[in-house]
Amino acid sequence: MKILIVEDERELSDSIAAYLGVENYLCEQAFTYADAKMKLGIYEYDCVLLDLMLP
C-alpha cells in the first residue's frame, strides 16, 4: 500500500513514516500543500494521511 503523509512537522512525519515502514507500507512525505498537490498530480496513492491544521 502506498501512502502519502502530508504533515508540516518533519519529526512527526518522520515518526509516522518510520512506524508505517516497519509495517511494510511504502510512504512518501509532503511538508507543504504545494508539495502534496504536486505529488498527487503525478503519482497514485492508496491512502493520504493529511494534517488538518496544515498552514
Where are these regions (language model features)?
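N-terminal/domain-start alpha-helical segments
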Residues: M1-P55
